[in-house]
């Protein structure tokens, strides 16, 4: 997904000498995962046939290709294309202890839809002693991007993304210890918070916290509670990186999952502690574009201009 944003608000970064943002009317970046190149897709479907070094080589090559594509397109803020993730958030469950990973899809036939993704059972205390892997992904991106930074007239800005705790909680089944989705979210919150702190310590200049579940369910949920959860998640990194959140309505096999309206998010989501909000626009034919002005009074707005669906 290609995004364009009009940079105006940098209030949380006013005292950060390490942050560099180009003076220009529009900044461009990407959201979400690039498609896997054929070699990485083949490796991901035949892991037993490859050694660990083979997999690392395939991933490095895929990140290099995604990065090269973004640079040749002239994007201002680049990512690793999430080439080491099988999904923007599903891969993170492999880092969690205290869960039993769901195996095969609960439904394999019929039209593609969200009910083809199963959920994981919670078997104990939710922990992530190895982190969530995002810091290692960012270190790989830095190493690959290093030579490309030389000789550039403008700084090359690298961005990382991590799903927020409410979105992560969506694929975990409640139990006696964690009786509902909010209890699961609270258990995941410090795990995500620690990952964000690790990314900032690694030198991440731009950081997106993906919370599409909040935008999907804003129409029938306590949006003030969402804001409280989000702000507690990011409070330790506010002012230390350019912070954004991505709000969309789902894109599993080209299908939305949530009520596709921005209106239910406002005005409460304007209290998010972020410099920028990403809003889904292109695949909704720029419906509610008038809402951008309302958001822009409080923070920068990044608008999706390429329809990935």
How would you describe each model-predicted region?
Residues 16-309:
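Domain-level signal for soluble alpha/beta catalytic cores
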């Amino acid at each position: 997904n290609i995004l364009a944003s009009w940079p105006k608000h940098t209030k949380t970064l006013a005292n950060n000498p390490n942050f560099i943002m180009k003076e220009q009317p529009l900044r461009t970046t990407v959201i979400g995962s690039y498609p896997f190149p054929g070699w990485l897709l083949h490796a991901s479907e035949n892991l037993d046939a490859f050694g660990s070094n083979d997999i690392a080589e395939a991933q490095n090559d895929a990140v290099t290709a995604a990065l090269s594509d973004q640079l040749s397109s002239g994007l201002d803020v680049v990512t690793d294309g999430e080439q080491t993730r099988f999904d923007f958030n599903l891969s993170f469950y492999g880092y969690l202890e205290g869960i039993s990973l769901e195996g095969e899809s609960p439904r394999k036939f019929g039209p593609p839809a969200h009910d083809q993704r199963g959920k994981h059972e919670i078997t104990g205390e939710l922990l992530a002693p190895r982190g969530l892997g995002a810091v290692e992904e960012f270190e790989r991106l830095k190493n690959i991007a290093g030579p490309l930074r030389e000789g550039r007239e403008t700084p090359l800005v690298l961005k990382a993304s991590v799903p927020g705790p409410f979105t992560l909680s969506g694929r975990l089944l409640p139990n006696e210890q964690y009786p509902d989705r909010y209890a699961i979210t609270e258990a995941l919150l410090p795990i995500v918070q620690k990952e964000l702190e690790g990314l900032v310590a690694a030198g991440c200049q731009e950081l997106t916290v993906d919370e599409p579940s909040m935008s999907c369910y804003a129409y029938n949920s306590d949006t003030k509670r969402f804001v409280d959860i989000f702000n507690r998640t990011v409070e330790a990194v506010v002012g230390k990186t350019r912070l954004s959140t991505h709000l969309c309505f789902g894109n599993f096999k080209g299908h939305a999952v949530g009520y596709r309206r921005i209106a239910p998010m406002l005005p409460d989501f304007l209290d998010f502690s972020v410099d920028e909000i990403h809003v889904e626009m292109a695949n909704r034919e720029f419906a509610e574009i008038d809402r951008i002005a309302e958001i822009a009074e409080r923070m920068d707005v990044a608008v999706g201009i390429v329809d990935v669906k």
